[in-house]
Swiss-Prot record:
Subcellular localization(s) per the UniProt record: Cell membrane
Keyword Transmembrane helix recorded: yes
Role played: Part of the accessory SecA2/SecY2 system specifically required for correct glycosylation and export of Fap1, a serine-rich fimbrial adhesin. Potentially the central subunit of a protein translocation channel.
NCBIfam families the record matches: acc_sec_Y2
Gene from which this protein is expressed: secY2
One Gene Ontology cellular component annotation held by this UniProt entry: plasma membrane
Deletion phenotype: No effect on general protein secretion. Decreases the extent of glycosylation of serine-rich fimbrial adhesin Fap1, but the protein is still found on the cell surface. The partially glycosylated Fap1 is larger than the wild-type protein.
Protein name: Accessory Sec system protein translocase subunit SecY2
Subunit details: Component of the Sec protein translocase complex. Heterotrimer consisting of SecY, SecE and SecG subunits. The heterotrimers can form oligomers, although 1 heterotrimer is thought to be able to translocate proteins (Potential). Part of the accessory SecA2/SecY2 protein translocation apparatus required to export cell wall proteins.
PANTHER family per the UniProt record, alphabetical: SECY/SEC61-ALPHA FAMILY MEMBER
This protein's UniProt keywords: Cell membrane, Membrane, Protein transport, Translocation, Transmembrane, Transmembrane helix, Transport
UniProt membrane topology term: Multi-pass membrane protein
HAMAP family: SecY2
Family (UniProt): Belongs to the SecY/SEC61-alpha family. SecY2 subfamily.
Length: 418
């Protein structure tokens, strides 16, 4: 049996990568259970239990933990925040033709700075165990170092998964989302204390609603607008079917993922600023009302989702770069002159679908939370409202992983020439 598995493991690339992925997920789950020795295992990291649960639901993308302090409490939040800042630097041409070593060095320093900032914020309200005669400040510094180290260990695991496994960083995000999705459902039904008959009814309604949501997400993910293109000097039976695909939702699930990550950053910044300017009423007001359990925070989140949807749409489909590549390859759009006219036409198409994608993202992510707050419901209801956007993210990421596996198996579709 073991020999058969060993032979199959050597022959199957998918099985090899799947094994690596499972191993890395196991290490990640193990790291989530390793406590930081300077903080009690039963201590809530920030505020009260309900606040920490809400923050964890919002930080499900990055895997951040507020209910207890573990090696991977920061998750991949610093890395994702760095990636957002890096994309802004590239978009605004603030980074030239740098060498790979210089790029890696700057990305490392940015990640380190963000990890230290988040570690400082997450340890602000922590209750440390006064052990070995160390002072409170010393224990906090040790905790910050351990949390930052855990972040870079997790980044290393994600890099290994990208090289040898399946999904790269996406797998870590998927694990976090599924765990949070499951815990939210269990917590909601346990708090409501439904009767058995009511539980079955609500369960069926939830299942039907979730099925419709998944179906609609798949429809949006696979939907695309095809711009017919002509290829100069190409005369084959397939040249007439050449096209430029533009997805119906050009930004995909990235506005949700990076929007949640960015919304986790202001609380840390306000913690640092309140240490520098204690008693500042403006900072105190912002630190309290910028959260998603408050109306100003939800409104900021909706605007952030909109701008991220437009930004990522143009990042994924840059009209200038697309037009430039088409001209270099001898391709053109029928009825459109290469150059400025082609750029304007592609920009018009991308902008149309970017606006539609932004509208869809706001409906899935912003409106449910806004409705819950306007009805005056509690923080648990906000967590339930986040389930809609979480389901959207999970489906999108799973479809991306499935596409990667299909690409690996694409060689099986071709017959041997010899």
């Amino acid at each position: 049996m073991l020999r058969k598995l060993q032979k199959y493991w050597k022959k199957s690339i998918i099985f090899q990568r799947f094994t690596w992925m499972i191993g890395i997920v196991f290490i990640y789950m193990l790291g989530r259970q390793i406590p930081i020795p300077t903080v009690g295992v039963d201590k809530v990291v920030v505020g009260n239990a309900s606040d920490s649960q809400l923050l964890e639901n919002f930080g499900a993308i990055t895997g951040i933990q507020f209910s207890n302090m573990t090696l991977f409490s920061l998750g991949i939040g610093p890395t994702m925040t760095m990636m957002i800042l890096w994309r802004f630097l590239i978009t605004f041409k603030l980074i030239g033709s740098w060498t790979s070593n210089k790029v890696n060095r700057l990305q490392f320093l940015l990640t380190l700075a963000i990890a230290l900032l988040q570690s400082f914020g997450i340890t602000n309200d922590s209750k440390f165990l006064l052990i070995f005669g160390y002072s409170h400040s010393t224990l906090r510094i040790i905790t910050i170092i351990l949390l930052t180290t855990g972040t870079f260990i997790l980044n290393w695991l994600c890099k290994i998964n990208s090289e040898r496994g399946i999904g790269g960083m996406t797998v870590v995000i998927l694990v976090n989302m599924i765990l949070t999705f499951q815990s939210n459902i269990i917590r909601y039904f346990s708090v409501q204390q439904f009767k058995f008959s009511s539980l079955i009814q609500y369960g069926l309604v939830f299942f039907v609603a979730l099925s419709i949501l998944i179906w609609f997400n798949i429809l949006l993910y696979k939907g695309e607008y095809r711009i017919p293109i002509q290829r100069v000097g190409l005369n084959t039976p397939y040249h007439a079917s050449s096209y430029l695909p533009i997805r119906v939702t050009p930004a995909g699930a990235m506005p949700f993922m990076y929007g949640m990550t960015l919304m986790m950053l202001p609380p840390y910044i306000f913690v640092v600023l309140l240490h520098i300017f204690p008693g500042n009423q403006i900072l105190e007001y912002l630190s309290v009302h910028i959260g998603l359990s408050q109306l100003p925070g939800v409104i900021c989140y909706i605007f952030l989702l909109y701008f991220l949807s437009i930004g990522f749409a143009y990042y994924n489909y840059d009209p200038y770069e697309i037009s430039k590549n088409m001209r270099n390859n001898g391709d053109y759009i029928s009825g459109k002159k290469p150059g400025e006219e082609t750029i304007k036409y592609i920009q018009y198409v991308v902008n149309s679908f970017a606006q539609f994608g932004a509208f869809t993202v706001i409906i899935f992510g912003g409106l449910p939370m806004l409705a819950v707050l306007l009805q005056g419901q509690g923080k648990n209801s906000v967590s339930i409202a986040l389930l809609i956007s979480n389901a959207y993210i999970i489906v999108s990421l799973l479809l991306g992983v499935i596409e990667q596996v299909d690409t690996m198996n694409s060689w099986k579709k071709y017959k041997n020439l010899i």
